[in-house]
Amino acid sequence: MGEIIDGKKLAKEIQEKVTSEVAELVKQGKKPGLAVVLVGDNQASRTYVRNKQKRTEEAGMKSVLIELPETVTEEKLLKVVEELNEDNTIHGILVQLPLPKHISEEKVIDAISFDKDVDGFHPVNVGNLFIGKDSFVPCTPAGIIELIKSTGTQIEGKRAVVIGRSNIVGKPVAQLLLNENATVTIAHSRTKDLPQVAKEADILVVATGLAKFVKKEYIKPGAIVIDVGMDRDENNKLCGDVDFDDVKEQAGFITPVPGGVGPMTITMLLANTLKAAKRIWKMN
């Protein structure tokens, strides 16, 4: 059976490093701060934001939550972002998506100062990622790279296939793998002979949003399989985009759902917030 990549354990190790670095900064009178803006009453977003707050505080950082009603105007939200851009105690700004339909997500993301864009969605940070310049990388893709490296595998020279082409996961993770000198293919719902394409991968990243979509015939024996999915199966049980039980014998390493990619996302957000603070303080 393939070796399980323990995302919880790795996330804890990275968070401990961040926490000890924050403690050193606090001794010097410097405290990194993360502000999260939550619009409306989406329960999933609320739970996720609460989790982010708890983890931010555990890391010794300042945590600010700004809650706005579903009916808030775009103008008011942009004003809130502008105030956070100018607030010297805040080093990371995150506007929880999705936003209500009457608000342009693009406008809001563009309004966040790219120095404080710890989600890595601002066009400047996206551009920096694509030219290989150090920047804020979206948290889930950053976590995926850490998970792959934790297996002790050298990414350079490997064939990587990413199934999924979203701006949040698929494209950035493909670019990060390219920056690590892998040979990368991006596949998606229109890709012909998808199982054959996937089976060439030494590293397979699956982000389709389709429960148990990837079966054993997609997997090269010994491949690293990273499952980004968070779905429900026919019994309403949490599962990923990879059929774990079908694939686990074939894979060399595999992330479980839950407990694989998920725990890494908030940890990388904390790492990005620390990085933002150090940049603003010119400590890098």
UniProtKB/Swiss-Prot annotation:
Keyword Amino-acid biosynthesis on entry: yes
InterPro entries for the chain: Aminoacid_DH-like_N_sf (IPR046346), NAD(P)-bd_dom_sf (IPR036291), THF_DH/CycHdrlase (IPR000672), THF_DH/CycHdrlase_cat_dom (IPR020630), THF_DH/CycHdrlase_CS (IPR020867), THF_DH/CycHdrlase_NAD-bd_dom (IPR020631)
Keywords (A to Z) from UniProt: Amino-acid biosynthesis, Histidine biosynthesis, Hydrolase, Methionine biosynthesis, Multifunctional enzyme, NADP, One-carbon metabolism, Oxidoreductase, Purine biosynthesis
One Pfam family matching this protein: THF_DHG_CYH_C
Biochemical pathway: One-carbon metabolism; tetrahydrofolate interconversion
Keyword Transcription: no
Record-listed NADP(+) binding positions: G164, R165, S166, S189
Subunit text: Homodimer.
Protein name per the record: Bifunctional protein FolD
Provenance organism: Listeria innocua serovar 6a (strain ATCC BAA-680 / CLIP 11262)
